[in-house]
């Protein structure tokens, strides 16, 4: 991919973040997400790429825009696959809480795992513990191997886990081992990235979250020379074996079979992101551990964007001031 595409993709996530911010704290996560989707799609279609959405808002019959298989861009230029999460943290945006982002990752054709929208167990570490993880082993054994690779006592490890009921036993186990636990309500893409940032205390992310977010995380973890393993899990194996959960879970397993993916099998990083020739962009909506959130005063808004180019392993933080009434008219309707 041409490196100048990176700045174009930063504009895409900025527009999505600004659109989501319009609905900040208003209690309507679906409207916020819809606005971000629309703004992201408009901006993507201005970029000189022949792009296909491979991780998006759902199937064509479930989502009007940015659905899996949708073509975006001008149709000219590099042929790329795109993984998007227009708002990573729709609930946080609706409730005015921290760590909401607009996110996208772009790679060469065939770069990303085409994962169904289901659950994924994830274990993620930074470069210092690369090669030290194996989801086939018990969690405690993994943590001891990670601590050994990082040359630190087990009690000095910092592990981030989503604060969900399904993780209560995991959090208790980690605390019993003496590990420091950061329990976050949502936002495992941001938490994944923190494992690889030189100024972050986070050593490990572990837990069960969304598979689409897992693939986005894999792209940036590969770009930053970290390591990750994942395992697709059906809904009834995560949320309880009710009739409804089993129906959804069986459908997920059927989708996996159709797509040639084996649920329950450990997926290595290079199976989820097959190249480090990726560009990743994330713009903060609300202030968080990774990025500052948007501040707005009248017609002006300030954003912070994390832009990562895997080929050169370059990390940029971009602070931008936007005069909203000078934006593309099609975007204005979603941000003003």
Feature map (PLM): residue ranges:
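N-terminal subdomain of lithium-sensitive/metallo-dependent phosphomonoesterases centered on the IMPase/IPPase/PAP
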Residues: 1-83, 144, 148, 175, ...
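Oxyanion/phosphate-interacting regions
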Residues: 5, 194-336
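General beta-strand structural signal in soluble alpha/beta enzymes
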Residues: 53-57, 82-84, 93-95, 114-115, ...
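Short acidic, glycine/serine/threonine-rich loops at helix termini
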Residues: 65-67, 95-97, 115-118, 169-175, ...
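DPxDG-like acidic metal-binding loop motif
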Residues: 77-88, 92-111
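Acidic beta-strand-loop-alpha-helix segment within the catalytic core
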Residues: 108-183, 288-290, 304-334
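Glycine-rich ThDP/TPP pyrophosphate-binding loop and its adjacent helix/strand module
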Residues: 174-181, 188-202
């Amino acid at each position: 991919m041409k490196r100048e595409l990176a700045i174009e993709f930063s504009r895409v996530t900025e527009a999505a973040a600004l659109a989501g911010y319009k609905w900040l704290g208003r209690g309507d996560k679906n409207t916020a997400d819809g606005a971000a989707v629309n703004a992201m799609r408009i901006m993507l279609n201005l970029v000189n790429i022949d792009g296909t959405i491979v991780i998006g808002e759902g199937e064509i019959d479930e989502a009007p825009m940015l659905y899996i298989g949708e073509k975006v861009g001008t149709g000219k230029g590099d042929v790329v696959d795109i993984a998007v999460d227009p708002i990573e943290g729709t609930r946080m945006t609706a409730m005015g809480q921290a760590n909401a982002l607009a996110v996208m990752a772009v790679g060469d054709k065939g770069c990303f795992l085409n994962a169904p929208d289901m659950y994924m167990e994830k274990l993620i570490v930074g470069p210092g513990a690369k090669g030290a993880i194996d989801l086939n082993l018990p969690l405690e054994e993994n943590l001891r191997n990670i601590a050994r690779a990082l040359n630190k006592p087990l009690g000095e490890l910092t592990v981030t886990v989503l604060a969900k009921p399904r993780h209560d036993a995991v959090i208790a186990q980690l605390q019993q081992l003496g590990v420091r636990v950061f329990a976050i309500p949502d936002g495992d893409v941001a938490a994944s990235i923190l494992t690889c940032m030189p100024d972050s205390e986070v050593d490990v992310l572990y837990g069960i979250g969304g598979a689409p977010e897992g693939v986005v995380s894999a792209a940036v973890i590969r770009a930053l020379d970290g390591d990750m393993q994942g395992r697709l899990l059906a809904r009834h194996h995560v949320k309880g074996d009710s009739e409804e959960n089993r129906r959804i879970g069986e459908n997920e397993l059927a989708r996996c079979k159709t797509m040639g993916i084996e649920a329950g099998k450990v997926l290595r990083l290079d199976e989820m992101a097959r190249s480090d020739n990726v560009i990743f962009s994330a713009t903060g909506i609300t202030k968080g551990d990774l990025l500052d959130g948007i501040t707005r005063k009248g017609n002006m808004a300030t954003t912070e964007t994390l832009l990562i180019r895997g080929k050169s392993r370059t990390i940029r933080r971009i602070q931008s001031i936007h005069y909203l009434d000078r934006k593309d008219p099609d975007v204005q309707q979603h941000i003003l």
